[in-house]
Amino acid sequence: MLAAVQPVQAAPAAAVAAAQVYLNPTAGPVGSAVTVSGTGFKVSTTGTVIVGSSTFSFKTAASGAFSTSITIPAAATGPLTITAKTSSVKASSVFTVTTSAPALPPVSTSALRFGVATAGGPLASAELDEVSQLAGESPSSVLFYKDFRQAPPITEMNAVRARGAVPLVTWEPWAWGGGLTQPAYALDRITAGDFDAYITQWGQALASWGQPVQLRFAHEMNGNWYPWAEGVNGNQSGDYVQAWRHVHDVVTATGASNVTWVWSPNVPYFGSTELAGLFPGASYVDVVALDGYNWGTSASWSSWMSPQDLFAPGIAQLRALAPGVPILIAETASAEAGGSKAQWNTDLVSYLAAQPDVVGFVWFHLQKETDWRINSSEASATAFNAALAARRAS
């Protein structure tokens, strides 16, 4: 039996691709040059790109594709529809008009320099931009933290220098998250050379980088909350000075003469370790520093402290230990609870500016144990800005 012969069906015509428009870039401020390209338009003909009330001509290729350059008009705002058309064929895409970022205020040349630490560190440029606008000046130093497992922070230091600031690197000899007892990081293990290869790597990298960097090694050593404090983690009296000198010598041997060594205890308090036994000596330190916070009534154990009450006793001890050595307030901020943070900000800058050997302060602009940020309230931000402006004018 013959099989039935089925009629041959014609293949359906290929669907014509819909016209498409592409923008590069897709966002930017007015005046931006934008490449508009398209496919699926009428072939080998002229067309028009419409941008608001402006028009730009183009010619399509034999494939129906085109590419042309346009400029975003000065009056454009927000989402801007860009349409390309050839006779009856048209397609659109949306360009987002952004506002140009305001120019950042410059770094002040005042004798009392302003620095900052932020949650995101040196690579979080938006945070640092915000601080510059809040303060009315850009920070002259940016404080950030590295533990003893991290590589030399060249990328972060480059970001700080690009802002016209000096990196203030807090180098912590422990493993973050490991707790107070970390025998591998005991001070005598550092002095014995267990970390010499790592310390040398840092020194060589800093020397090769070659630009000014402040190195704050093993800070707040007079407290009991870090494993490099004496009396914890197996550390004995005298171990801290030996470890500091060893790290200093290893780094210095690499030729890292661009490093400024910052010795930075906490403000002395009842029960803290005496500073005299922790000071490595003037030949091992370039800057002496203090960390101190006004906790106000934000904690059960704390009370409001004026800037002078907070810092004057420690500054007096630093002057006695290291006469003529510059003094830095390496971390400070105030809580809101318990008093007027706005007034505290004003008093801080006024008090520090009156101390001829205090070369700067670094504000801890973080929301952590409490809201330490400059703009924890509008009143705080306004007072901070005004205080810096007054010291610039003096």
Briefly describe each language-model feature range.
Residues M1-A101:
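Extracytoplasmic/secretory-pathway segments with low complexity and glycosylation-like composition
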Residues T99-Q150:
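Boundary/entry segment of secreted carbohydrate-active catalytic domains
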Residues S108-A119, V325-S394:
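Substrate-binding cleft of secreted/luminal carbohydrate-active enzymes
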Residues A119-A126, L143-N158, A175-G178, R189-Y198, ...:
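Acidic-and-aromatic substrate-binding clefts and catalytic sites of carbohydrate-active enzymes
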Residues L128-E137, A151-V169, Q201-G210, L278-S283, ...:
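Acidic (Asp/Glu)-rich catalytic clusters
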Residues T155-E172, V287-E336:
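Glycoside hydrolase catalytic-domain groove-lining segments
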Residues T155-W263, F384:
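Substrate-binding cleft of extracellular glycoside hydrolase catalytic domains
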Residues W244, H248-E274, G324-A337, G360-L366:
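Aromatic-lined carbohydrate-recognition surfaces of secreted/lumenal glycan-active proteins
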